[in-house]
Amino acid sequence: MEIKGKVHCFFEQSGTFKNEFIKLGIPAEDYDIQNNFGETDHTDDLFRVIEDAYDGKPSLFDRIRGGQEDLIIAFFPCIYFSCLSQMSIYWGCTNYRKLSYKERTNEILKRVANREYFFGLAAKMLCVAQERGIRLIMENPWSQQTYLKANFILPPTMVDNNRRLRGDYFTKPTAYWFINCEPTHGFSEQCDKKSIRILDCKAGKEAGVCSEERSMISPDYARNFICDFILGKEQINSQLSLF
């Protein structure tokens, strides 16, 4: 994939990808609701940005060019799609053990409503990119019974089943949706990190926002992903591919 313009990195931890794009000589900026590390270029309510763009109102998307110019890579919040969230849809969930059945039901209905809202945002974001001819890659976890496996507008373009093989901290099977573009196929092997379990990480503080620990991406993984699946760029650690 050739990027003649700029890469726009959306949501938490996208700054890691931004930095690696810049190291590779590609201009990039990141956008997030939070700025916990003091490095975010643009602190925007991306949920409102998506809603406005979908409704035809002025938005950030108006400044993003289509065709072969710009690229969006969006690490869309997964908190209500994850398998852990799915386990909280049952009365028998451990978190509800001290609640009455009505209280359990209310908690479940609240979670389902939040999931519906974020599902809608993800679908709208992809629709906006599709209709405007903007290249976009959306990332979301793909382990066990994650909600999007059976309940999304289209299947993922590709799944990275073991991110540790490309230098990440987590195994964390991850799906990627490519809109108006196709992935290249390379394999830059780098398995040199101590494995971290998602269950050992802290939970997020508010709805739709994952904790920094759970969403952490290693710079090595970001660089290897960019070279393997976006730029088609060989590295010293690149392996031969069947594609």
Residue locations for each model-derived region?
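Conserved active-site and SAM-binding loop architecture
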Residues: 1-243
